[in-house]
């Protein structure tokens, strides 16, 4: 959405409506273009209570979930042999209560959970029912479980190509349920069997209430064979690495960072690249909204400004930007902002002197013909930070 304000008398109601649009339905940015003549003009302020929002612009989904959808979901859960919860960023955007309701439902049903890059933290990463992240950079067990499942319950994910791969071969034998407040995301990439265009918090709470009020019971041993197969896949230990005596591996560095900070009030942001994927794999988030990263757009230079914002909003928290050296350089001047506002953000740089993800693709697909992926002129980051009085 975007607005061009030509009349100053419309400015306050435009701002109110823009914030309503940004927060309703699937959250997203709204641009308000205020020309210079409007900036210098004066007008009476219109309070939000007096603004008549245009209904076609405020997309918030249904206010309640269809009971028939709930009954069908419970019926399929009870009949399935190999179910899985596939959870995306929509669960986080719905608010922390959505994660609480998801955990309740998972514990009742004994169904495994996998999350997207943006869904990390919706379900505790160290919980045995978590298969961690799926997709191109996900775990072996998560990807195999998605492919082999007979029931897929999509909670606020968009079936993006990093998860599905070839659409014609994606989870061919599963019944698919899709929860999404954005109607345009349903049946967009993958055809689903059942759908609800309802806020996820409301949906999951309604399902949990239905189960409790109707006395619905689930056989916890129903999926023993499924869990046995998953444990066999887990045995491959797809994220295994060996830490030697000479060089600190990035996986080890992030794992140790997690072990030393997971008991504190911590927010983690990242730049974009291999370090971002290692952070997603080895930092096990136990709470929602503690992981801030640029996924869909993949914007290098994102991490430090995001850390500054997180620290401003949470002054008592530990805020860490896990960065690669090339991505960090793209917004390095923001050290000045952090210093000026006395924000104690921590920058954790994994410096391998390469744009690692670019190099990785050049090795995999282009016969190791490297082009513009090696960074030869790097500063001493410690001295550079000190020059900003950091």
Name these PLM-found stretches:
Residues 228-305, 310:
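Active-site diphosphate/adenylate-binding microenvironment
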Residues 89-177, 286-316, 329-332, 374:
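Glycine-rich, anion-gripping cofactor-binding loops and their flanking helix/strand elements
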Residues 1-14, 36, 119-226:
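Glycine-rich, acidic loop regions that bind phosphate or pyrophosphate groups
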Residues 20-26, 69-84, 105, 146-148, ...:
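Glycine-rich phosphate/diphosphate-binding loops that line cofactor/substrate pockets in enzymes
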Residues 1-40, 117-120, 146, 156-178, ...:
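Conserved thiamine diphosphate
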Residues 34-40, 89-91, 183, 272-276, ...:
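Glycine-rich beta-alpha junction loops
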Residues 148, 187-189, 195-197, 201-205, ...:
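Thiamine diphosphate
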Residues 17, 21-79, 239:
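Conformationally flexible catalytic loops at phosphate/diphosphate-handling active centers
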């Amino acid at each position: 959405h975007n607005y061009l304000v030509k009349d100053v008398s419309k400015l306050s109601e435009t701002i109110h409506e823009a914030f309503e649009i940004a927060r309703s339905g699937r959250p997203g940015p709204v641009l308000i273009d205020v020309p210079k003549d409007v900036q210098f003009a004066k007008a009476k302020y219109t309070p939000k209570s007096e603004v008549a929002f245009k209904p076609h612009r405020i997309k918030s989904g249904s206010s309640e979930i269809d009971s028939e959808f709930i009954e069908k979901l419970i019926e399929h859960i009870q009949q399935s042999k190999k179910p899985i919860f596939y959870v995306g960023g929509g669960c986080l955007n719905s608010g922390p209560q959505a994660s609480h309701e998801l955990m309740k439902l998972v514990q009742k049903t004994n169904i495994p959970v996998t999350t997207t890059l943006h869904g990390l933290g919706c379900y505790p990463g160290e919980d045995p029912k978590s298969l961690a992240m799926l997709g191109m950079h996900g775990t072996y067990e998560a990807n195999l479980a998605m492919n082999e499942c007979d029931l897929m319950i999509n909670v606020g994910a968009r079936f993006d190509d990093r998860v599905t791969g070839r659409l014609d071969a994606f989870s061919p034998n599963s019944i698919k349920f899709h929860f999404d407040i954005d109607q345009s995301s349903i049946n967009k990439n993958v055809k689903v069997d059942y759908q609800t265009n309802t806020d996820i918090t409301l949906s999951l709470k309604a399902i949990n209430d239905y189960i409790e009020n109707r006395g619905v019971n689930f056989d916890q041993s129903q999926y023993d064979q499924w869990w046995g197969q998953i444990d066999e896949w887990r045995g491959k230990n797809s994220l295994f690495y060996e830490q030697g005596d000479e060089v600190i591996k990035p996986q080890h560095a992030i794992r140790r960072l997690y072990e030393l900070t997971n008991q504190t009030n911590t927010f983690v942001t990242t730049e974009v690249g291999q370090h971002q994927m290692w952070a997603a794999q080895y930092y096990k988030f136990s709470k929602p909204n503690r992981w801030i990263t640029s996924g869909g757009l993949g914007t290098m230079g994102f991490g430090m400004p995001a850390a500054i914002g997180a620290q401003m909003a949470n002054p008592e928290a530990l805020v860490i930007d896990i960065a690669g050296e090339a991505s960090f350089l793209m917004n390095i001047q923001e050290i000045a902002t952090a210093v000026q506002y006395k924000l104690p953000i921590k920058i954790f740089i994994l410096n391998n002197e390469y744009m690692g993800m670019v190099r990785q693709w050049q090795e995999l697909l282009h016969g190791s013909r490297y082009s513009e992926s090696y960074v030869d002129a790097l500063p001493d980051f410690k001295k550079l930070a000190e020059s900003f009085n950091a």
